[in-house]
């Protein structure tokens, strides 16, 4: 998937794009495993050593607030994220 699709998704939901936000959205759009914030951080950190866990958590919160991604709460300790916001079974 090209970064352009992630950028377009951010623009569609009126989220100001940044390098980190585009990378996080791109990861979500490419991985259908409903990753946690830690999984996303661990996947992106080797390519983006300036990325912090706080940035990942804050970015995911913005995505959820704006409706760009879906929050899937398994229990109090396991929040997962899904870029597919159309109704579907989990």
Language-model segments: which ranges?
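Short, Lys/Arg-enriched N-terminal segment that forms or immediately precedes the first helix
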Residues: 2-14
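Short amphipathic alpha-helical elements of helix-turn-helix/winged-helix folds
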Residues: 9, 26-31, 43
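Short helix-capping/hinge SLiMs at alpha-helix to coil transitions
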Residues: 15, 29-32, 46-47
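Pre-recognition alpha-helix immediately N-terminal to the DNA-recognition helix
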Residues: 22-27, 39
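Basic amphipathic alpha-helical segments that dock to polyanions
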Residues: 56-66
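Non-DNA-binding regulatory cores of transcription-related proteins
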Residues: 65-90
């Amino acid at each position: 998937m090209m970064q352009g699709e992630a950028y377009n998704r951010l623009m569609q939901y009126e989220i100001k794009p940044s390098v980190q936000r585009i990378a996080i959205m791109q990861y979500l759009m490419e991985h259908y495993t409903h990753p946690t914030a830690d999984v996303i951080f661990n996947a992106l950190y080797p390519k983006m050593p300036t990325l912090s866990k706080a940035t990942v958590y804050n970015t995911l919160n913005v995505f959820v607030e704006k409706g760009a991604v879906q929050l899937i709460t398994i229990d109090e300790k396991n929040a997962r994220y899904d870029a597919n916001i159309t109704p579907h079974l989990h």
